[in-house]
């Protein structure tokens, strides 16, 4: 707390609820810190250090500020004594770290501030071991009063791969290097298989538990910890991961040992994709009902095989390349035959329905279909007509396990903006982009969802999906601006 002048009064509200308030919180005030733990789990402890009287903090006393003071909240007891001078040094060290990090980021003539803010957000959602969280919160509702409340504090292959690829393209290769090591570390035994998601330390078991004693945000129950989606088959996940691995292989091959380790991982992923792409799955939206043959899942399986074949060619593994190219061709033929629906003049969400889905917009950026293909043009226009509402996009607007979605899914609006841009509707794309930027909070942060009417941010916050898509879309316009300036 930086004191400027006068004698201002402050009161500290310190109410930690360890172990999700499943037990009573106990406070142990020592001469150095306030130690907090729960009656339901006394192994996990929190330590609050401060230059203010510690007992006064616990008693909610009012303090008169006459000089700089500090608070330090830690999950570990500090070995070295903590004082105001040390904390000022730690603050300066932190400031220098983030200044250096942003200095390594590409700069742009327009939208640079929002690009930088989003990249910082993605970085802060990264763990030191390379894992990247989908969000930092659990159970903030997609719509107030409904039950679409999920725990996003995990590392999905899909979300993390997209986040890391965004950081990689903007100049942060170290993030990609660490993530690759994290993925490799999840195989602790030869018989291990890939999951779609992991805990931040590589945990495989992510059992979902409902905390009935908590009322939730604005009384939106249930509050969940854990996520049972880790059991699901989501065939699209490997496409995002393989796209990242290909970019990494192409630009940062590494040592011979690293190349060989990566090649073993690629072969394992290819084997899984070949075995699974014909099977129904839960898709990018993690449907909790019966699996379907989602078009976006088939497309991303094609991406996985296509990128695997490219890597094989780089390594002169032509037999592998040939096999995977043939399998990729089979997927493309299958999608063109079963995914395109003449009745709606568009690709559909799944082989067995005529529904539209925002994930269909990803067919072009991942190279499955050309931007000038008439089928993609028609799909973009059909998706826009069906799912764009008041400047924002539904991911889909048909019934699922919980009814019809009632809020906008932020990343989908960015997908539409890119799709409109590449099919030539650049002015409309720019207008939509400038409009959605107005719906961030005062720090430029986005959650998962936005209310169509009030523009209130909903869902878990901040959301990696939203920020990686914002960066990619902003870069699209910034690169065009650069071309116009230096033409």
Which functions belong to the PLM regions below?
Residues 2-487:
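Acidic, mature catalytic/reactive cores of soluble proteins
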């Amino acid at each position: 707390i930086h004191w400027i002048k006068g004698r201002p009064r402050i009161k500290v509200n310190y109410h930690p609820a360890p172990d999700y308030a499943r037990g009573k919180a106990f406070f142990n005030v020592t001469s150095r810190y306030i130690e907090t733990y729960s009656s339901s789990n006394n192994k996990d402890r929190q330590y609050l250090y401060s230059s203010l009287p510690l007992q006064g903090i616990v008693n909610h006393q009012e303090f008169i500020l006459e000089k700089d003071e500090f608070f330090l909240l830690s999950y570990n007891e500090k070995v070295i004594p903590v004082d105001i001078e040390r904390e000022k040094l730690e603050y300066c060290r932190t400031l220098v770290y983030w200044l250096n990090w942003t200095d390594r980021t590409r700069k742009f003539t327009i939208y640079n501030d929002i690009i930088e803010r989003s990249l910082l957000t993605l970085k802060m959602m990264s763990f030191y071991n390379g894992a990247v969280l989908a969000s930092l919160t659990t159970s903030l509702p997609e719509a107030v009063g409904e039950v679409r409340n999920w725990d996003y504090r995990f590392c999905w292959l899909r979300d993390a791969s997209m986040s890391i690829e965004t950081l990689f393209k903007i100049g942060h290769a170290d993030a990609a290097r660490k993530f690759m090591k994290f993925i490799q570390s999840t195989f602790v035994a030869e018989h291990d298989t890939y999951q779609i998601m992991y805990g931040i330390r590589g945990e495989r078991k992510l059992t979902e538990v409902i905390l009935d004693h908590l009322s939730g945000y604005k009384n939106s129950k249930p509050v969940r910890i854990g996520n049972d989606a880790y059991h699901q088959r989501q065939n699209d996940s490997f496409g995002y991961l393989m796209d990242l691995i290909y970019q990494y292989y192409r630009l940062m091959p590494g040592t011979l040992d690293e190349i060989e380790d990566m090649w073993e991982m690629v072969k394992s992923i290819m084997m899984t994709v070949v075995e699974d792409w014909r099977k129904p799955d839960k898709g990018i939206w993690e449907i909790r009902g019966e699996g379907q043959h989602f078009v976006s899942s088939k497309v991303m399986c094609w991406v996985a095989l296509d990128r695997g074949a490219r890597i094989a060619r780089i390594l002169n593994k032509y037999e592998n390349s040939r096999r995977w190219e043939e399998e990729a061709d089979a997927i493309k033929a299958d999608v063109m035959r079963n995914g395109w629906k003449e009745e709606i003049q568009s690709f559909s969400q799944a082989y067995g329905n005529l529904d539209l889905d925002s994930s269909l917009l990803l067919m072009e950026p991942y190279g499955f279909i050309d931007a000038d293909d008439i089928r993609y043009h028609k799909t973009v226009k059909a998706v826009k007509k069906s799912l764009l509402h008041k400047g924002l996009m539904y991911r889909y607007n048909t019934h699922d396990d919980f009814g019809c979605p009632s809020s906008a899914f932020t990343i989908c609006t960015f997908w539409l903006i890119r799709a409109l841009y590449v099919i030539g509707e650049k002015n409309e794309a720019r207008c939509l982009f400038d409009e959605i930027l107005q719906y961030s909070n005062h720090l430029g942060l986005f959650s998962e969802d936005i209310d169509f009417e009030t523009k209130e941010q909903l869902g878990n916050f901040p959301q990696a999906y939203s920020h990686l898509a914002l960066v990619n879309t902003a870069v699209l316009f910034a690169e065009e601006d650069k071309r116009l300036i230096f033409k």
